[in-house]
Amino acid sequence: RLRMRLRSMRDGLVNVLAEMVDLKDPLARRHAERVREHSVELGRRLDLSGSDLQTLSTAAFVHEVVDLRMPAHFLGKNGPASEIEHQLIRRSFELGIQMLEDLPELEEVVAVLKFVHEHFDGSGFPN
């Protein structure tokens, strides 16, 4: 019963986070849903456990939350970012992660989100 209550609280929190993203960028909600669908399908093909699939699904759905502190004009910017813009993007990402780290219900989700801007070739950030 306690586990169900905790899951319900986490689901409610995830919905609030999704609404926050939706308020900043209405197209982001559909994007988040597509990312979740593709991520879960990939996780199934990799035979992830049920709990890992749930974590992946949640992380994929709320991945835009880490960008909430991103200046709005960066969201639709075309072309390469300047060094100053890269620094701002990284800092906004770090602040978004810090915001989510204050939510113990999302500890595993945050562990996944920390790598959302990493690339297979080792480029990207934060590492």
Positions of predicted regions on the chain:
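Juxtamembrane or sensor-core-proximal signal-transducing alpha helices
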Residues: 1-5
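Histidine- and acidic-residue-rich, metal-dependent catalytic cores
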Residues: 8-127
